[in-house]
Design a protein with these regions (language model features):
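Membrane-interface micro-motifs in multi-pass membrane enzymes
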Residues: 1-32, 37, 223-234
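Membrane-interface transmembrane helices that cradle and orient dolichyl/undecaprenyl
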Residues: 25-44, 77-86
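Membrane-interface alpha helices of multi-pass inner-membrane proteins
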Residues: 34-36, 44-63, 68, 104-107
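Transmembrane catalytic cores of multi-pass membrane glycosyltransferases
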Residues: 57-63, 72-228, 232
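Signature aromatic-anchored transmembrane alpha helix within multi-pass, membrane-resident enzymes
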Residues: 103-106, 246-282
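Hydrophobic/aromatic-rich transmembrane helices and adjacent perimembrane loops
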Residues: 217-246, 255-258
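Short periplasmic/luminal acceptor-recognition loop of GT-C membrane glycosyltransferases, typified by
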Residues: 298-370, 384-402
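Aromatic/acidic, Gly/Pro-rich catalytic loop(s) in extracytoplasmic/lumenal soluble domains
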Residues: 381-436
Length: 436
């Protein structure tokens, strides 16, 4: 249920399960920390969060901040009930009683925090600002800037917030011995929403003509909406399960309501599963490879031919070959096991490398988006210059662009071997002397 809510009702595109990345491991440790939190094994919360920071400093860092906000919120909004006051967790008490575990968490967190802090230490302020603008406003705005979020994503997240609010109010009916546990989890989600609210404010400031705009852009790099995409579905889904358990204990009517809810959730999950598997291509290829809604066979054929050309490249080119590749793909390195000059999906993190990446995008990706001929709009001498500049040995382009050019390309076509054979993709080899 959590994965469905995260996949369908996220605001900023944050996923928890969907690929093998450092943040997936970080979320595992965040979940372990939350498990320790609700089981009142507070000493283990901090090492788990430290491990999360070590794998992904933003995931672990925002989770830590959300938890600290939750604990501080408990101190501010203390219950008037004496029994509940004894159950509530004091931040000061936690830090005093578990100082060693907190220190261990900080040391682990430093493993993930120091590398990004040191990466840009030599970059000048102008380069850092330019890199922030590229990252926030040009490349990742759909994850970082509220105004770039689609209306459907905002509407979906509002629905999720309504579910979350309903769950929070219903959980008050749980017995007192467990209410504090759920209150901490709900408070953690609210803490993540407070972080997102700060991101909303920064998004607004970044779009104003003021001296604070540049500073806001720099701060928006840190994914202020990320943790809410995780924490709110997590709290809502676990709360829904708790509510169904509560209903089950309330006689026949409650059991009927609980059963109906479980069946409805199962049917929704089944429908989503069927919808996701209606296209057999991996999601990375679904997202970028050419698709034709009115011609599924052409879509499947394009995917098969993409696999074929990548397999040919893997088996027939030197391991140190470097390719200029099509914009409409993000899996070349995965299938072909070769490097490429630039890819829209592969964004470096240090400031100078990001500026260099943006220049490559300008020369090699933007032309593919502006013109039907893509890179074939360049004359051969210009393609040769770009190959020399970036050390490219091969050019991979769609067949349709080759078919549209009026003057034959002077570069040697190596795939398909017979130029008369038509394939979805064509590989040209740059002259060795030019590249060297």
């Amino acid at each position: 249920m959590f994965l469905v809510l995260n996949d369908r009702f996220h605001l900023a595109g944050e996923w928890v399960v969907g690929g093998f990345e450092a943040k997936g491991l970080a979320y595992f440790f965040v979940l372990m920390a939350l498990g320790s939190l609700v089981q009142k094994q507070l000493k283990w919360v901090w090492p788990y969060l430290g491990f999360a920071c070590a794998f992904h400093v933003l995931v672990g860092g925002w989770a830590t901040i959300a938890l600290l906000l939750a604990l501080m919120g408990q101190a501010v909004f203390r219950s008037s009930d004496a029994n509940e006051q004894r159950e509530q967790v004091s931040l000061g008490t936690v830090l005093k009683q578990h100082a060693g575990f907190v220190l261990a968490g900080l040391l682990l967190a430093a493993v993930g925090a120091l590398p990004p802090l040191l990466a840009d230490i030599a970059a000048n302020p102008a380069t850092k600002l330019m890199a922030s603008q590229i990252y926030v406003q040009a490349r990742i705005s759909h994850h970082l800037v509220f105004s770039a979020f689609s209306a459907s994503r905002v509407a979906g997240f509002v629905v999720l917030l309504m579910i979350f609010g309903m769950v929070g109010s219903r959980l008050k009916r749980l017995d007192k011995s467990r209410q504090t546990d759920w209150r901490l989890l709900i408070a953690f989600a609210i803490g993540s929403l407070c972080i997102s609210f700060c991101g909303l404010m920064l998004s607004g400031v970044s779009e104003q003509a003021s001296v604070l705009a540049d500073h806001s852009v720099g701060l928006l790099r840190f994914y202020w909406f990320r943790m809410a995409d995780f924490a709110v579905p997590c709290a809502a889904s676990l709360g829904l399960v708790a509510i169904m358990q509560l209903l089950w204990r309330r006689g026949m009517l409650g059991r009927a309501a609980s059963t109906f809810s479980a069946v409805a959730i199962a049917l929704a999950m089944a429908w989503i599963g069927i919808d996701r598997h209606s296209d057999p291509r991996p999601r990375a290829d679904q997202a970028v490879l050419p698709s034709y809604e009115d011609n599924q066979e052409r879509t499947a054929g394009t995917y098969r031919n993409w696999l074929r050309v990548c397999d040919w490249i893997k088996n027939n080119t030197p391991t140190d070959a470097k390719f200029i590749t099509p914009d409409q793909q993000q899996t070349f390195k995965w299938y072909a096991h070769r490097s490429e000059v630039v890819n829209w999906k592969d964004v470096p993190q240090d400031a100078q490398a990001m500026v260099d990446w943006s220049q490559r995008v300008g020369w090699l990706i933007q032309p593919q988006r502006r013109a039907e001929l893509g890179l074939m709009t360049y004359p051969d001498w210009r393609l040769r210059e770009l190959a020399v500049t970036y050390g490219a040995t091969h050019l991979l382009v769609p067949q349709r662009q080759v078919d549209l050019i009026t003057d034959a390309c002077d570069f040697k076509q190596v795939y398909p071997v017979d130029p008369a054979t038509k394939a979805t993709y064509v590989v040209f080899e740059f002259p060795v002397a030019d590249v060297e």
